[in-house]
Design a protein with these regions (language model features):
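Conserved functional hotspots at enzyme active or ligand-binding sites that engage polyanionic ligands
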Residues: 1-115
């Protein structure tokens, strides 16, 4: 498994363990989970990355595409996309398939009204 310390080889669609937030409030995701990098590869040099958290508790929908992660179906919460310092990212957990990345793109376009 690749460490998050090697960010220069990271690409859109990579999945990392997300370290627990210290002060999640309201409906913000808490606890241990994963995050999908949704930021364009051309901007990986920035000090923060755009990531979308995952959950096993939400129902699949157009804005919660389902991906397979370590043999389990999880949903990507694209409406909760946020900027994080790459140092908040833990271990590399995998990479989305091309089909999964297309579903993420569709969900992001819907949530951001980019159609």
């Amino acid at each position: 498994m690749r460490s998050a310390k090697n960010w220069t080889n990271s690409v859109r669609g990579d999945v990392y363990r997300l370290k627990r937030p210290r002060s999640a409030q309201g409906h913000e995701q808490q606890g241990e989970r994963y995050a999908v990098v949704v930021q364009a590869n051309a901007y990986e040099h920035l000090s923060t990355w755009l990531v979308a958290p995952t959950t096993t508790k939400s129902f699949g929908s157009m804005i919660h595409p389902t991906i397979e992660l370590r043999g389990q179906d999880v949903r990507v919460l694209v409406e909760q996309t946020t900027a994080v310092d790459p140092q908040r990212l833990g271990d590399f957990a995998g990479r989305l398939s091309p089909g999964e990345l297309i579903e993420i793109n569709v969900a992001l376009r819907a949530v951001l009204d980019l159609e």
